[in-house]
A protein has these predicted regions:
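Carbohydrate-associated surface elements
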Residues: 14-17
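Short donor-sugar binding/catalytic loops of nucleotide-sugar-dependent glycosyltransferases
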Residues: 36, 47-52, 79, 101
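Nucleotide-sugar-dependent
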Residues: 54, 102-109, 116-137, 142-155
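A short helix/loop element that forms part of the nucleotide-sugar donor recognition site in Leloir-type
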Residues: 24-37
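A charged, aromatic-enriched C-terminal amphipathic alpha-helix characteristic of glycosyltransferases
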Residues: 169, 173, 186-216
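Nucleotide-activated donor-binding/catalytic signature segment of Leloir-type glycosyltransferases, i.e.
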Residues: 68-77, 83-107
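A conserved mid-protein helix/loop that constitutes part of the nucleotide-sugar donor-binding site
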Residues: 42, 50-65
């Protein structure tokens, strides 16, 4: 927009906010979903649209390389690749796919993991943060981001120390990062605290609404 208006129009980017009152940190063992599923160990979760743009083949390739049986993967959502994920999970003891979950259940299912996976397709950087990221932060979950390091979410992760970055289409690097995170799982508490703090401050609803008010006043 700035380029098209040649600087003649003031442009301000206001992000979405986190639903901090509806979503907050819980131990995964205290969630309804965790107690319904036959899943254990250290859990990485991908929740959201399971489409072609999410780089899911890369994730599945990385999972196939992970040999540590104490690491599990939970996929939640629907989309064009849902049947592929379901079939993959039927072949892997440490992979579970449960399909679409209602948004009203976010507090429960976002907390049914130790680390949340977020992806962003190539060429999408600069267009904002994947919306699910805000409530992942509200749940106090570290983010394993797969995508361009110049993207908004990558910059957010680096600035506030709320997760890790892996370049897309590199299953070996992703596998190594997954294993690194597991090996250093005892140090996650500071990242968890950072995630919730960012949701409570930078992406608090009141703060975002005040920015709209200031802009429109």
């Amino acid at each position: 927009i700035k380029r098209k208006t040649k600087g003649k129009t003031k442009v301000e980017l206001i992000p979405n906010w986190a639903d901090n009152k509806e979503v907050f940190p819980l131990r995964k063992e205290d969630t309804r979903l965790y107690n319904q599923l036959e899943i254990s160990g250290f859990i990485f979760q991908f929740a959201g649209n399971l489409g072609y743009a999410q780089g899911l083949d890369n994730i599945l390739s990385a999972i196939s390389l992970v040999e540590n049986k104490n690491i599990s993967f939970l996929f939640i959502g629907g989309g064009a690749k849902a049947e592929v994920i379901k079939a993959f999970g039927e072949q892997k003891e440490n992979v579970i796919y449960i399909g679409f979950q209602e948004r009203s259940m976010q507090k429960d299912f976002l907390n049914t993991c130790d680390v949340a996976i977020v992806t962003l397709s190539d060429g999408m950087y600069g267009l904002g943060v994947p919306s699910k990221s805000y409530n992942i932060m509200a749940a106090g979950k570290p983010i394993l981001y797969i995508g361009d390091e110049k993207s908004e979410i990558a910059l957010c992760i680096k600035e506030y120390n709320i997760g890790w970055l892996v370049k897309p289409d590199d299953p070996y690097s992703l596998k190594n990062m997954i294993e690194y995170i597991y090996q250093n799982k005892d140090s996650l508490i500071s990242i968890q605290n950072n995630a919730r703090l960012v949701a409570d401050t930078v992406f608090a609803k009141e703060r975002i609404l005040n920015r709209y008010y200031a802009l429109l006043s």
